[in-house]
């Protein structure tokens, strides 16, 4: 099985909150697709609660689009990481990590200011959500407040390259 790019970076050296360009590819038609690692907490040190990350998924998806989509950028998907330390965001275009960090910060402010109670969580019903009872706005707001406590940084692949001796054969 091929070694995926996300397993070629040293998770013990990742900072959070931080943006990392996880992958860039060009489609056969010439479009650029960029995948960003949006790391909310430090791997193996902290973890986002299941209910909190699920609620963040609902909030983050819309607010990031509000702040990042443009004539040259269109978000395809924002999905929680299985390790529950952040989200992957795939998009058409190639915004800078700094632009993504700015949009991320603005979307976090929106999550606090525009969603004061659970009735305001988008798509929170059995028809649009596969686990609509698995939410916590309190946990999501705690995640947001923790992100906003410090500037959102940039994790660079060259700084996180995993020593080949540590890679599983």
Swiss-Prot record:
Homodimer. GO terms for molecular function: iron ion binding; S-ribosylhomocysteine lyase activity. Involved in the synthesis of autoinducer 2 (AI-2) which is secreted by bacteria and is used to communicate both the cell density and the metabolic potential of the environment. The regulation of gene expression in response to changes in cell density is called quorum sensing. Catalyzes the transformation of S-ribosylhomocysteine (RHC) to homocysteine (HC) and 4,5-dihydroxy-2,3-pentadione (DPD). Binds 1 Fe cation per subunit. Its cofactor is Fe cation. It comes from Glaesserella parasuis serovar 5 (strain SH0165) (Haemophilus parasuis). InterPro entries: LuxS_sf, Metalloenz_LuxS/M16, S-ribosylhomocysteinase. Its EC number is 4.4.1.21. The keyword Hydrolase does not apply. This is S-ribosylhomocysteine lyase. Keywords: Autoinducer synthesis, Iron, Lyase, Metal-binding, Quorum sensing. It catalyses: S-(5-deoxy-D-ribos-5-yl)-L-homocysteine = (S)-4,5-dihydroxypentane-2,3-dione + L-homocysteine. Fe cation binds at residues 54, 58, 129. HAMAP family: LuxS. Belongs to the LuxS family. GO terms for biological process: quorum sensing. It is an enzyme of class 4 (lyase). The lineage of its organism: Bacteria, Pseudomonadati, Pseudomonadota, Gammaproteobacteria, Pasteurellales.
């Amino acid at each position: 099985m091929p070694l995926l790019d996300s397993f070629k970076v040293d998770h013990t050296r990742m900072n959070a909150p931080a943006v990392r360009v996880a992958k860039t590819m060009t489609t056969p038609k010439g479009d650029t697709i960029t995948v960003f690692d949006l790391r909310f907490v430090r791997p193996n040190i902290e973890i986002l609660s299941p209910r909190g990350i699920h609620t963040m998924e609902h909030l983050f998806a819309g607010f990031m689009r509000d702040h990042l989509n443009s004539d040259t950028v269109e978000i395809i998907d924002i999905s929680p990481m299985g390790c529950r330390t952040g989200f992957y965001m795939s998009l058409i275009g190639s915004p800078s990590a700094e632009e993504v960090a700015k949009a991320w910060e603005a979307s976090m402010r929106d999550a606090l200011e525009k969603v004061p109670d659970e009735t305001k969580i988008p798509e929170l019903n059995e028809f649009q959500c596969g686990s609509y009872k698995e939410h916590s706005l309190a946990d999501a707001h705690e995640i947001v407040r923790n992100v906003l406590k410090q500037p959102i940084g940039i994790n660079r692949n060259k700084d996180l390259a995993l020593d080949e001796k540590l890679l599983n054969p």
